[in-house]
């Protein structure tokens, strides 16, 4: 398994960042290696927003689709992503949001394992570099959309 966490202060309001993270259909516009994002079966209740989502990731002819269950818990300002289908054997991804003076402290945690042991080994070697690149893409996107820096 590969796991990592990132903690950053992002120059936008908490609700703006949460909305951006939940909008996976826009990920291809800014997330490296993301080709397509789709949302299915979206539900919105008083305390929870949830949906099933697909992310197609890769480069040129090498790509995979990951299906996940995404839930945003309004009371705790936490987004939890778990694996439904695709090349992952295991996925736990959490986003925690805390507003601090019109900025948002974002804590991101991911733990995953691919079904293919060879690909799993390759991913472990480049995982941290890729994760940092993706985290930077979210930060840049937030600044572009909300310009509070």
Spell out what each predicted region is.
Residues 140-149:
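Short, highly charged C-terminal tails/helix-capping segments
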Residues 82-129, 133:
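Beta-strand/loop substructures that line and gate deep hydrophobic ligand-binding cavities in soluble
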Residues 1-48, 102:
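Hydrophobic ligand-binding cavity/cleft-lining segments
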Residues 9-13, 56-58, 71-73, 98-100, ...:
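Solvent-exposed residues in well-ordered beta-strands and their adjoining turns
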Residues 39-84, 137:
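Glycine-rich portal/gate segments that line the openings of hydrophobic small-molecule binding cavities
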């Amino acid at each position: 398994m590969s796991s990592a966490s990132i903690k950053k202060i992002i120059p936008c309001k908490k609700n703006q960042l949460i909305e951006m993270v939940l909008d996976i259909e826009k990920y291809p516009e800014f997330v490296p290696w993301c080709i397509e994002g789709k949302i299915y079966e979206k539900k919105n209740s008083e305390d929870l927003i949830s949906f099933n989502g697909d992310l197609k990731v890769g480069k040129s002819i090498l790509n995979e689709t990951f299906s996940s269950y995404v839930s945003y818990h309004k009371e705790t300002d936490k987004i939890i992503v778990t694996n439904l289908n695709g090349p992952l054997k295991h996925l736990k991804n959490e986003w925690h949001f805390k507003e601090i003076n019109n900025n948002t402290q974002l804590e991101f945690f991911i733990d995953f394992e691919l079904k293919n042991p060879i690909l799993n080994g390759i991913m472990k070697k480049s995982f941290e570099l890729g994760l940092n690149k993706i985290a930077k893409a979210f930060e840049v996107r937030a600044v572009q959309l909300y310009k509070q820096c």
